[in-house]
Amino acid sequence: EEYKGVYVFAQQVDNELSGIAFELLGKAKELAADLSTDVTAVLIGSGVKGLVDQLAEYGADKVIVVDDPELKEYRTEPYAHALASVINEYKPEIVLVGATAIGRDLGPRVSARVATGLTADCTVLEIGDFPINPVPNQEQKHNQLLMTRPAFGGNTIATIACPDNRPQMATVRPGVMQKIDP
């Protein structure tokens, strides 16, 4: 399997990490443990190397830093290019992005560039089999990211998988996942 690892887009604004980065790292740690893999934070910005230790404290095993003066302020095109380039080079199995104003802009553009699906506004993320219940004449795949989100106006929930494409990408609203204490 050439795709490996759980990656988190570590959002920062004005060289300060957003709370969602820590929440996603907490969830990524759980998912990575289930997959026997590691957690990588992707930090994009200008002069952001000072944030690396904080990401490590909150669960990142590795941090990939894309540091360039052009990336000082969030702009769609340069950030999408940076994150898509990291995904294409390192081939993560899972990529988590916060469903913030930045993440909602960035996530869909990046998933389109790397030709994979994106499940937005997930409330539950877990590793499991898909289809969840075996179906005759259909292979049940193991170790899939099962992404649960509200559907149809929030009256029901849907659990979505992306069995045939990698990475599996999800956005998660702030406040849904728990950060781990360093």
Give the label of every model feature segment:
Residues 1-182:
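N-terminal glycine-rich FAD/FM-binding segment characteristic of electron-transfer flavoproteins
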